[in-house]
A protein has these predicted regions:
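Short helix/turn-capping signatures at newly exposed starts of structured segments
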Residues: 1-153
Length: 153
């Protein structure tokens, strides 16, 4: 687990890889005496989402079988997405460093990349346009996953 790793859209963050099984990481985490909490969410009659919360900072959502679906980071992360976006950036900086911004599903996506997004905090999570966000709003959470299916027509 490395808080300095590059944020790779739809692929990985902090040394965890989308699509891999969480069970391949747990022995290492326990050996390092990292705090790991697990919460199970029901998603319909037969599907469950398992969330592993690591050091109260990284949240990894997995399928019932342990496949990593997405990874979110809050509070502390030093790596960057494409060497330009990072945790703690302002909305104004995102606008100035990217060509296109889209708000969907309470999240801010950039440059039509649907593998990385910033989560909009309350009360801004119901806003539809980036122009309606305060320019000095600090973005304190991001998610890496494979969200392309959300945007298919």
């Amino acid at each position: 687990m490395n808080y300095n790793d590059e944020i790779k859209s739809g692929t990985s963050v902090a040394g965890f890889d989308i699509g891999e099984n969480i069970n391949s990481y747990l022995p290492y985490l326990y050996l390092q005496e990292v705090e790991v909490d697990r919460v199970i969410f029901s998603k319909g009659k037969s599907n469950e989402i398992h969330r592993y919360i690591i050091d109260k900072n990284i949240k990894i959502n997995t399928s019932e079988k342990g496949e990593i679906l997405n990874i979110s980071c809050t509070n502390t992360y030093y790596g960057k997405y494409k060497n330009m976006l990072y945790l703690g950036i302002t909305v104004q900086e995102v606008i100035s460093k990217t060509d296109k911004q889209v708000i969907m599903f309470d999240s801010l996506f950039v440059n039509q990349d649907y593998g990385f997004c910033f989560v909009l905090p309350y009360p801004y999570n119901d806003i539809d346009y980036i122009s309606h966000l305060p320019k000095d709003l600090v973005l304190k959470e991001f998610i890496v996953g494979r969200f392309e299916k959300w945007f298919r027509k």
